[in-house]
């Protein structure tokens, strides 16, 4: 409590002496004062001397020998000049009554002080009345010292000084009155004044003069304003002015802004001198710039790094600027077949930092054309490819007999700040002979009671010419030690002598001159049971007998037909258990992976619908509103409530009335396709309604609709990482489809749907059929009679109708471009024929605005003319995952110095001089929706538009960040074009 009371007392200590403003001072009079006296025999004006023996006008009275004295002295009208409390300083002398011989008992040594308020000078000889009311008594004034006869003889002056105050006063002015009632005294001097708190700089703020309050205990709050180059902290700045004109109780404070330091006892905030800086607000002094940095002017908040030196985003401002490291040294490589060990020593110069790491760039130079391309994602790095902290790495899964160039980059925290590529050391190696990689997928072609025919794909990395394959198999109930091995020169084999109805485990491996590769993952297939075999024979027997009755001439044809029918019957009679097992893999393949079955291969397409799509009762479906129109009918939104499950929001495609059987079959074929897929990035089929009208396909509902329109509506609203996340989802969905041997053929942003969580899902499987052979224009016409999407389609698919997963990869590259450009039309307003011609001449789309170079490089990889050189969807997913894990890789913006060295289509901003009006210019840059806004704001000429800044663009009403950036970039180009024209004229 004692400490708290001491703190409160310190707050009340005055900060600076009060300022006194004099309203009246009798000592300054050079002539008679002329104050009113009553009665005339009382107070008398005489000349006298002050303590310094200066001549002054005084009043005296000494009627001590007469009783009942009531002598009044009234000043002239005194204007208060805004004061609320008045102070009166009186200097006077009083005769000691005891020193006066024979003085009566009525002798006094005191007098009274009064005041009277008025708005103007209205006093007369009789008004106000000479009495206490209407006069207001201030106090009775007594002398501290009085003089006697002895003092008079010795000419000793004993002057008393007393100060009294009164208030509040509110009229324009007042009078003072002095009442003597029987004393012998002299009123030597009277000074009337008021007090105010002085102008002061306290706690970094300026407080102007403030009048004191009306009472002695009053506290008048005054707001301060920060001194130049200071700003408020804590609470609003206040000081309190007390009744005596003293500042008390400081609250809050101002501090010097960043770039300024407090000097002259905190009364001035001075800009940091050249060569110093201050990053934050406060009263501390500026500090000298760290090494390799400087300031360009006074008042710096940070020091700018010198040329060639940089500061990382997280580096403190007082840390020296650093530079990029030099290249690693003494690289040692050790090749072992298709693997490689690299070791090196650290750079000679680390750039002055301790966060040195290494990146490995792998380039394959095996094409023989002198150009190297980046290695695919199949190459493995241990411990990792980027961000190595140790000077060594193990690289495996390289291609055999291939030349590689490895760049070992030295990077640190400021490498991204430098406009130059990282310093690196490179090493060239050639891999040796190696065995092939594992076979990735195997599927059943046919089966009987004692045989199974299998087929598989070639290894992803054959590493040479495949000589033959070795198939190993054994019964599931037995161990691997009981396996039997057979060889096949091709990738198809029929295994004979199996048990009826038994489940077998199969594995296959490839052989080159380098030896056998690894076995594939285990695959499970089951032979037919005797009952299944007999059933299939009975189903086909009438066909065989009927055909033989046609005669011996057709016997050979009948036998062939019977064999074919039996074979297809065997394939169709697979048990449910086999249907599940034949698609199951372990090891290399993803568990649960299935192979896509084209529903058009079914003799009865309705059978495909029954097999792959779930029939839903119409009573479970509730259509709510139409949201669009499709090729076969309307697209609606609604709800689906299945028994025992919660109600969900769904999209419903309906088949319009009056349909033909072919239209019904084509409509339901999409459900037969979708029903085979189960992946979070592929649109999910809930089921179909075929037993009532209208026929419906019911899918999950995607709240944000198609990706292209969604991006256009949200132009510039997403971060690069969010866009990469969308691309990663699309790639994951396409990887799943490719692994099922499904080719989409119409991959485009318009066929990607987006839900409320920004999850992108592949949809629209209407073009996923082979082109008809009898089409009149195979370059442009599809099996469904619609146009091939030229802008999204790979050149080999346009020219030869060769659709593969590799052609889907090309389309995916176009989707990447659509996403990064926020739904801009690929190839802009070029005609389809111009697009085909440009692609044939190896022209490719340029990077969209603000597109990271790594993403544009991936687009260019997808647009390789040779489809075998394009990445697979699995590699694309891995690449995007690495970008998401390392966002710094997305900081470098295109243009990119690519190893592919493909020419890019020029989509520069047009020269403004080719347009007659601002409206035409806005249309040309695809911003025509703002024509009216520009006109209303007065931006109707190119001279005015060229001066627009970001605040002007906002004022016009352009709120989308992408549109703001596009217009601002176009204006900057316009300025450059204007400057160029002016320089030519000069």
Curated annotation (Swiss-Prot):
Please report, in chain numbering, the residue ranges of the motif PDZ-binding: 984-986
TM ranges: 544-564
Q: Give the active-site positions.
A: 746 (proton acceptor)
EC?
2.7.10.1
Origin: domain of life: Eukaryota
**Xref: Pfam families:** EphA2_TM, Ephrin_lbd, Ephrin_rec_like, fn3, PK_Tyr_Ser-Thr, SAM_1
Print the keywords alphabetically. Answer: ATP-binding, Cell membrane, Cell projection, Developmental protein, Disulfide bond, Glycoprotein, Isopeptide bond, Kinase, Membrane, Neurogenesis, Nucleotide-binding, Phosphoprotein, Receptor, Repeat, Signal, Transferase, Transmembrane, Transmembrane helix, Tyrosine-protein kinase, Ubl conjugation
* Cytoplasmic compartment segments: 565-986
Please list which residues make up the signal peptide.
1-18
- Which reactions does this protein catalyse? L-tyrosyl-[protein] + ATP = O-phospho-L-tyrosyl-[protein] + ADP + H(+)
* Topology of the protein relative to the lipid bilayer: Single-pass type I membrane protein
Mind telling me which InterPro entries this protein's record contains? Eph_TM, EphB2_rcpt_lig-bd, Ephrin_rcpt_lig-bd_dom, Ephrin_rcpt_TKs, FN3_dom, FN3_sf, Galactose-bd-like_sf, Growth_fac_rcpt_cys_sf
**Ranges facing Extracellular side:** 19-543
Residues modified by carbohydrate are 265, 336, 428, 482
* Chief location category: membrane
What's the PTM story here?
Autophosphorylated; ligand binding stimulates autophosphorylation on tyrosine residues.
- Boundaries of each Fibronectin type-III domain copy? 324-434, 435-530
Enzyme class, spelled out: transferase
Where ATP is bound, by residue? Answer: 627-635, 653
Where in the cell?
Cell membrane; Cell projection, Axon; Cell projection, Dendrite
Q: What range(s) does the SAM domain occupy?
A: 913-977
Q: Which PANTHER family match?
A: EPH RECEPTOR A5 (PTHR46877), EPHRIN TYPE-B RECEPTOR 2 (PTHR46877:SF11)
Assembly and interactions?
A: Heterotetramer upon binding of the ligand. The heterotetramer is composed of an ephrin dimer and a receptor dimer. Interacts (via PDZ-binding motif) with GRIP1 and PICK1 (via PDZ domain). Interacts with ARHGEF15; mediates ARHGEF15 phosphorylation, ubiquitination and degradation by the proteasome. Interacts with AQP1; involved in endolymph production in the inner ear. Interacts with EFNA5. Interacts with SPSB1. Interacts with SPSB4. Interacts with SH2D3C.
Q: What role does this protein play?
A: Receptor tyrosine kinase which binds promiscuously transmembrane ephrin-B family ligands residing on adjacent cells, leading to contact-dependent bidirectional signaling into neighboring cells. The signaling pathway downstream of the receptor is referred to as forward signaling while the signaling pathway downstream of the ephrin ligand is referred to as reverse signaling. Functions in axon guidance during development. Involved in the guidance of commissural axons, that form a major interhemispheric connection between the 2 temporal lobes of the cerebral cortex.
* UniProt-recorded name of the protein: Ephrin type-B receptor 2
- Say which species the protein is native to: Mus musculus (Mouse)
Query: What is this organism's lineage?
Result: Eukaryota, Metazoa, Chordata, Craniata, Vertebrata
